[in-house]
Amino acid sequence: QKSLKEKGYKGQIYQTHGVANADFLRVCGKDCEGTLLPAGPVLVADQLPADHPVKKSAMEYVNKYEAAQGKGTVSTFGAHAWDAGLLLATAAPVAMKKAQPGSKEFRAALRDALEGVRNLPVAHGVFNMSPTDHLGFDQRARVMVKVENGTWKLVK
């Protein structure tokens, strides 16, 4: 992207969620201004409307992460692990009521419990899992973001 700008490209630049980190902003600098990208809501959690279904969970992650690692250190990548932990914390107790951990029956019960998770808000969206959908996210799992003044801004 930086090279495109240096060569005089004036068109709109779109990126993927893979650039949603502080290093991208640092390396690209002013050449990133105006870039649009879809990202998980956690990237702009503090800018989400109060009634956004992900705001509370995303802010919980951001606050805990930054309390441990420092202000401005949060990235979307760690939030994926956080979300997986919340998913497991929701499903494991259900599976443990049906079988002993470590057994074949427990693995099947855990799979069934994971596939049964509904309306679980996490940092990146709201999980609604099923036997045919192991991602479990819908449109609430992404927002449009624009680089403005070297920071991420929610596009409203």
Where are these regions (language model features)?
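Extracytosolic ligand-binding ectodomains
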Residues: 1-156
